[in-house]
Amino acid sequence: MSMIEVSGVTKTFDGFKALDDMNLTVEKGSVYGLIGPNGAGKTTIIKNLCGIYKPDSGKILIDYNNVYENTKIKERLIYISDELFFYATYSIKAAAKMYSELYPKWSWERYESMKNIFKIDDKRKIRRLSK
């Protein structure tokens, strides 16, 4: 049974085809790795799978459901960038508040628990944290 199905997906940025008619099927229970040089499209396909980008053409299904603008599917996915994408002035607490508004299953109780376990000062600015 296919868990992820990518069919004929193309994504272009300023005339550069990052993905060109890509096809991929991932069966339930499988583990895949994406390997390739810079610019090969690894991050682009991940962002398409998470619904961050919308393909120019083709379709992406997870459990037979379209990903883009699908809240139920997006609740099950996360993309963690290696680049800072918060406002430079955001504190950890401010970022948590933003996420609490985006994710219906957000738990402040779990947030407080993790903050205490890892001894995190949530008043610290995100830009001051190490990766």
Predicted regions and their residues:
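Short hydrophobic beta-strand immediately N-terminal to the Walker A/P-loop
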Residues: Y32-L34, I46
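Conserved structural motif at the start of ABC-family nucleotide-binding domains
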Residues: I4, L19-D21
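Short coil-to-beta microelement around the adenine-binding A-loop and adjacent beta1/P-loop entry
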Residues: F16-K17, T71
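ABC-family P-loop ATPase nucleotide-binding domains
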Residues: K72, S81-K131
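Helix-to-loop junction immediately C-terminal to a conserved catalytic motif
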Residues: C50
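Walker A (P-loop) phosphate-binding loop of ABC-type ATPase nucleotide-binding domains
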Residues: P37-G41
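Conserved ABC transporter NBD signature motif
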Residues: G58-I73
